[in-house]
Amino acid sequence: MDWLAKYWWILVLVFLVGVLLNVIKDLKRIDHKKFLANKPELPPHRDFNDKWDDEDDWPKKDQSKK
C-alpha cells in the first residue's frame, strides 16, 4: 500500500479523464438543432420593480428648485 500513498494522484487523474470522456460522449448525443426547433415558449418575465417605482426618493426633474 506504499505505492498508493505515493501515486494517489494518478488514480485521481484517471478518474477525472474518465469523467471527462463520459461528458464528451454524452454531449455528442445531444441534438441541439432539434431542441432549438422544438423549444417551448418562455412565459413573459415578471419583475416586481414596478411596486417600488412610486416610492422614488430622487427629486423630479420637472419640479422647480425652492
Curated annotation (Swiss-Prot):
Protein name: UPF0370 protein YpfN
Feature: compositional bias, Basic and acidic residues: 42-51
Chief location bin: membrane
Keywords: Cell membrane, Membrane, Transmembrane, Transmembrane helix
Region ranges (Disordered): 39-66
Compartments where found: Cell membrane
Organism domain of life: Bacteria
Gene: ypfN
InterPro entries registered for this protein in UniProt: UPF0370
Organism: Salmonella arizonae (strain ATCC BAA-731 / CDC346-86 / RSK2980)
Annotated family: Belongs to the UPF0370 family.
NCBIfam families assigned: PRK13664.1
Record-annotated membrane-spanning stretches: 4-24
UniProt cross-references to Pfam families, sorted A to Z: UPF0370
Any one annotated GO CC term: plasma membrane
Membrane topology classification: Single-pass membrane protein
